[in-house]
Amino acid sequence: MSATWTVTGSAAFIVGSGAGGNETQTGCDNERTGCDNADSISKKVQIEGITTGVVVDYGIKDAMNMGAAMAPAACELIVNHLSDFGREASYYDRIVTGDLGSVGQKILIDLCRQKGVDISKNHEDCGMKMFDATNQNTGSGGSGCACSATVLSAYYLPKLRSGELKRILFVPTGALLSPVSFNEGESVPGIAHGVVLEAVM
């Protein structure tokens, strides 16, 4: 099932120019952050690099299948990023997309394989992390820009700060459509950009 559930949420991030230092985090919750003791070092997270994406249109017209519309743009971004930086997919602990959902994830992995890139072992999607699709019957997963914002802030950043993850390629995904373009039967182009987030040791 390609249908998704729209996520309502928001998050804000402060980006500074100073390197700063690591902070002592007291009374940390093992389940939340994965730290092993009561006093743990909370690492800073830095933006190590970015890749600007391009609009990709595969002619998808089904507004209930946004994962299929956005997956080609995510693939283009990931492949271009790895080529530009001279890296393998395994360089990242996780390659995280925004809201492709389970259907879009399969398409993305297949498209990347066709271009000689295997992300099957370390790809995750914020839309899939948002819900328990089996128990909540949420189809392909969550959709909307809130997926990227909330899951990054509440799930991935804590894992980077605790040291559980060292480096991720964060790829928020978007679909370019409006009620007018949908009613006129236009295709839905996709877009994705990439940000490398790295824990400062």
Give the location of each predicted region.
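Condensing-enzyme catalytic core mediating Claisen C-C bond formation in acyl metabolism
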Residues: 1-79, 84, 121-128, 167-173, ...
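Claisen-condensing/thiolase-fold acyl-transfer catalytic domains that form or cleave C-C bonds
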Residues: 40-42, 67-71, 82, 93-201
